[in-house]
C-alpha cells in the first residue's frame, strides 16, 4: 500500500480519455508533500537530461547540477570516460566543486584537503596512515548513473535503473532524424532563471500550442498551426509543425521544408529543433521545491563564431520569447492558489488532435497518475 495521503491519490486511468479530461488538482502544484513524493518516485528514479555532450567533451571538463536538493558533479576523466558523482566529500559532507570549468587532475575538498581522482577513487586523505582501520574503499566518491544519449548527457540516481533508451524508446533516432547535426552542436547562450513555478506547471505550458497565438505573436507568425501535430510516444512526445519565414522571429529562405520539432522528455526536459539549420534550444528543468524550479534555457548552434543573424535570434529569445513563457507560468502558479480557481481546469483536447489541442497535457497527467496511484 502507498503511504500517500488520500488527497494525493489519483486513479490509474486519470486523464486516459483526453477529450473528457480535467487537469490534476491545484494542490499537486503547490503542496510540498506532493513534491516530496515526486522527489523519491520521479526524480530519484528517472533519467534526467542535464547537459549537451559538447560541454564535457575534453579531459578534465566538469559541470555541476542541482536537482531536488542534490548536487551532482559530472567530470570527464583523463581516460576520456565521463562519470557522475554526488558532489559531496565522504569525510564530513562538504561539497567538492561548484559551477563548471576545468578540474585539476585530482579533486581536492576545500575543507580538509581530501583528494580524489577523477574516477572517484581516493587519492589521499591526510593522516590516514595514523588512523586505525582506515578503509580507502569506503572513502570513494559515490557514483551516479550516467549515459550519453542522442548528443546529450543524462543522469539517474537509481543505481539499478535500466538504460535511457528503455525509458525513452525511439527518442534518440527521432532526434537524430530531426537534427542530424545534434552531435556537432555547441552552447552559444544560456539563460538561467529561478522560476517561481512548479515544474509540472512549466511542462503543462510546453505541452500545448493553444496559447501560442495569444501569448507568442512572434513565434505564431512563423509556425503554421494548421500544419502542426502533437504525437504521444510513452515517456516522450513530439510537437511537429511546418514553418514559414518571419521578420519577427525565424528568418530563412522561402520554399524550404523548414519545420519545428519540439520533444518533451519525461519528466522535465524539452528539446527544440528550430527551422534554422544547425540550431537547437533546450529547456532543462531542475526542481527546487513545490513552487520553485531552476531552469537553464540553452541555445546551441553548430558554429562557434556566431553570425549577426544568430546573435539577433539569441536576443529575441532572451528579450521576447523566453519572458513571454516565464510570465505565463508565474501567473498560473499564483492563480492556482486563488479562491476563484475551481481546483481543476478543463483540458481543451479536440477529437482531431489539432495544432491547438491540449491532449499532450492529458497524456502527461496520465503519466503522473501512475506515480500518484494508491
Swiss-Prot record:
Keywords in UniProt for this one?
Answer: 2Fe-2S, Iron, Iron-sulfur, Metal-binding, NAD, NADP, Oxidoreductase
**Record flagged with keyword Membrane:** no
Q: Does the keyword tRNA processing apply?
A: no
Give residues annotated as binding [2Fe-2S] cluster.
Answer: 89, 91, 109, 112
- Xref: Gene3D superfamilies: Naphthalene 1,2-dioxygenase Alpha Subunit, Chain A, domain 1, Rieske [2Fe-2S] iron-sulphur domain
Q: Could you say which residues bind Fe cation here? A: 211, 216, 325
Pathway it belongs to?
Amine and polyamine metabolism; carnitine metabolism
Catalysed reactions, semicolon-separated = (R)-carnitine + NADH + O2 + H(+) = (3R)-3-hydroxy-4-oxobutanoate + trimethylamine + NAD(+) + H2O; (R)-carnitine + NADPH + O2 + H(+) = (3R)-3-hydroxy-4-oxobutanoate + trimethylamine + NADP(+) + H2O
What enzyme class is recorded for this protein? oxidoreductase
Q: What is its EC number?
A: 1.14.13.239
Domain of life of the organism encoding this protein: Bacteria
- Give the protein's biological function: Converts carnitine to trimethylamine and malic semialdehyde. Can also use gamma-butyrobetaine, choline and betaine as substrates.
Subunit and partners: Composed of an oxygenase subunit (yeaW) and a reductase subunit (yeaX).
Please give the name of this protein: Carnitine monooxygenase oxygenase subunit
Q: Tell me the organism.
A: Escherichia coli (strain K12)
Taxonomy of the source species: Bacteria, Pseudomonadati, Pseudomonadota, Gammaproteobacteria, Enterobacterales
Amino acid at each position: 500500500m502507498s503511504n500517500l495521503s488520500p488527497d494525493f491519490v489519483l486513479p490509474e486511468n486519470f486523464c486516459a480519455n483526453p477529450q473528457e479530461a480535467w487537469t490534476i488538482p491545484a494542490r499537486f502544484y503547490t503542496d510540498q508533500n506532493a513534491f516530496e513524493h515526486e522527489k523519491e518516485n520521479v526524480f530519484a528514479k528517472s533519467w534526467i537530461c542535464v547537459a549537451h555532450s559538447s560541454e564535457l567533451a575534453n579531459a578534465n571538463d566538469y559541470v555541476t547540477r542541482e536537482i531536488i536538493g542534490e548536487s551532482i558533479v559530472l567530470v570527464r576523466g583523463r581516460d576520456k570516460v565521463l562519470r557522475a558523482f554526488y558532489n559531496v566529500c565522504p569525510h564530513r559532507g562538504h561539497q567538492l566543486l561548484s559551477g563548471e570549468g576545468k578540474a585539476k587532475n585530482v579533486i581536492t575538498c576545500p575543507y580538509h584537503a581530501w583528494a580524489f581522482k577523477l574516477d572517484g577513487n581516493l587519492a589521499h586523505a591526510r593522516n590516514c596512515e595514523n588512523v586505525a582501520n582506515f578503509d580507502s574503499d569506503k572513502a570513494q566518491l559515490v557514483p551516479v548513473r550516467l549515459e550519453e544519449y542522442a548528443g546529450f548527457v543524462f543522469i539517474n540516481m537509481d543505481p539499478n535503473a535500466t538504460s535511457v533508451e528503455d525509458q525513452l524508446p525511439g527518442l534518440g533516432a527521432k532526434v537524430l532524424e530531426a537534427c542530424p547535426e545534434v552531435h556537432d552542436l555547441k552552447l552559444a547562450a544560456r539563460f538561467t532563471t529561478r522560476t517561481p513555478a512548479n515544474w509540472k506547471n512549466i511542462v503543462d505550458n510546453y505541452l500545448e500550442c493553444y496559447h501560442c497565438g495569444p501569448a507568442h505573436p512572434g513565434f505564431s507568425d512563423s509556425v503554421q498551426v494548421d500544419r502542426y501535430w502533437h504525437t504521444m510516444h510513452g515517456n516522450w512526445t513530439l510537437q511537429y509543425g511546418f514553418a514559414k519565414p518571419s521578420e519577427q522571429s525565424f528568418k530563412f529562405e522561402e520554399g524550404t521544408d523548414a519545420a519545428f520539432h519540439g520533444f518533451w522528455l519525461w519528466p522535465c526536459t524539452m528539446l527544440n529543433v528550430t527551422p534554422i539549420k544547425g540550431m537547437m534550444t533546450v529547456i532543462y528543468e531542475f526542481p527546487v521545491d513545490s513552487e520553485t524550479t531552476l531552469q537553464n534555457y540553452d541555445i546551441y548552434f553548430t558554429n562557434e563564431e556566431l553570425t549577426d543573424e544568430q546573435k539577433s535570434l539569441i536576443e529575441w529569445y532572451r528579450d521576447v520569447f523566453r519572458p513571454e513563457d516565464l510570465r505565463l507560468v508565474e501567473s498560473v502558479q499564483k492563480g492556482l492558489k486563488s479562491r476563484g480557481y475551481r481546483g481543476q481546469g478543463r483540458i481543451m483536447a479536440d477529437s482531431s488532435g489539432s495544432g491547438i489541442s491540449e491532449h499532450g497535457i492529458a497524456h502527461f497527467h496520465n503519466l503522473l497518475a501512475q506515480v500518484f496511484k494508491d
